[in-house]
Structures are given as C-alpha cells and as structure tokens.
Amino acid sequence: MRSQDVLLATAVAVLVISAFCIVFYPRVQDFMVGNSLWNGLAGFSGEYKASCLDSATQLPRLPQGKVLLSIPYLSYTEEELTELKRFVTRGGRLILMDDYGQGNEVLEYLGLQMRFSGKPLLDPLFCYKNPRLPRITDFAPGVRKAGVKSVVFNHATILTNMGAGEVLAWSSDRSFLDLNGDEKWSPAEPKGPFPVAAKLKVGKGEFLLVSDPSILINSMIGKDNNRSFLEYLMGYNIEPGGLLVDRAHLEKTPLDESKLKLARAREIFSHPLPAMGLLALIFGGVARYLLWSKGGKID
C-alpha cells in the first residue's frame, strides 16, 4: 500500500472514530438536556418531551400554549431580549430560574423591579441533609391546591424588590442569606422568610421566577414535591410539544459544542437535497482519487 493510501485511510479512521466518540461520550455539563448524570436534565426533558432552543430568536411566532424555560448563565443579546419580551407579551409563559443573579438583565430589560439576590440562601433547621438544601414549605394557596406541600432547593438564592409580583413560595423564618460565605448566621445577615418563587402578568403572558434551577436536575426532580411544583409552574394548558428549553445561555464544554454541531449537520443532511449533494461530493471525490491513484489524468 502506498504512503498516500495509508495517509488517506488514517485520516478517514480518525474522523470516524472522533465522530463516534463525540456521539457516544456522555454529556457531563450542568443542566444539559442530554446529560443523564446527577446534574443533567435528561430525566426532566424526556418526561415532559421538551424541545431545545439554541437562541431566543428561534422562539415561535405564536407563543400561546408555549412555555420557555431559561437558566441564564450566559448573557443575552439585545435581539434575544427583544424576542423574550415579544414571546411573553404575546401570550407565552417564561420561567426564569437563576441562583447567581445573571437573570437580572432580563428583569431590567422588561422594566420590572424584582431581582435575584445572587447571595446563598441557607436554612439550618428546615433543610434536606444540610443548610444548603433548604426545604420550602410555605406556598401560595394556588400552589398548595396543586398538591405541593414541600420542595427541596439546592444552593438557592432569594428574590428581592417584589413590587407587583405575586409570591408563590417563601423560605422559612429560620433561613438566612449567607453574605460572608461562612455558612453561619451573623447579626448583619438578613433572616427569612424570603420570597423564592413568584409570578406576574406581562402583556398577554406570564413571567415566573424561581431562585434555584437545580430543582430540575436528575438528582433533585424526585425530591419531595419538586415534580408537582414544576408542573404547576409550567401550567396545565401547555400544548403537546410546547415546552421549550433554552440551552443557548448555559455554559458548554467543547464536547457539548461538538455534539451540537453534529446534531445540526445531521438535521441538515436529513433533507433530500443536501443529502444528495453530499453523496455527489463523496462519489466525485472517491472517483477522482481512484483515477489519480491508478495514474489516470485528471483535468
């Protein structure tokens, strides 16, 4: 076998093996829909048949009956903020779940007073295993009517400046904001109860805020009434296939980016014309190579 043949075979093998590794190696990043480990959303997205968006500009033009769930760990563009506002004001339901305060840019853009504190919420008494897993037991009547008696948060924060927002859930009176990070209450640190979930009307739609996205992950969704609480937040008039998960504003590893690119390529070449074009390129390339390798003339 000639050296050119060896190089070509090696290159093809490397490409094929790389593609297989990207496809079959599991996702490990927090809140990724395809991540079936403890910190992923595979369970939630599979159970509720969620669709993923890679940009807020992909939001449907008719948002009634649709729910967008966003965890804002990356900033939004001006165009995306405009699309979010359009989605809500025209009848969509936006659920913003945040524990670090990045979601405040959405609140500011919408002209709302509410904010995510970004400071850790601890509860040494009403908690699951440790104070960083506060157990929420105080709910608005509508939430209690939906069968929600307790919800377990995981490294949460609180909501502030509620304004016209309707509070859906509060932490206990033993909870506090750990401003100095020592995990102990001091007189300078505010004590609860604090709002941790709220909703308000925005145009024809609804905007819901939850101060902890971790209730979605595989290891938390089954705790207490977390699943029932999420179902209440999503609403019961959601259309089939109407749950949308915004993955554009989640931090991604190089593996995640590669998986997304492969998925987009697979989507493109699943249509007849692009697939035929790709096959024509492959056959043409193989034919030229075979002709060249046999000493033929290629014009």
Task: Report each predicted region and the residues it spans.
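Short, surface-exposed patches at the edges or C-terminal ends of soluble domains, predominantly
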Residues: 1-299
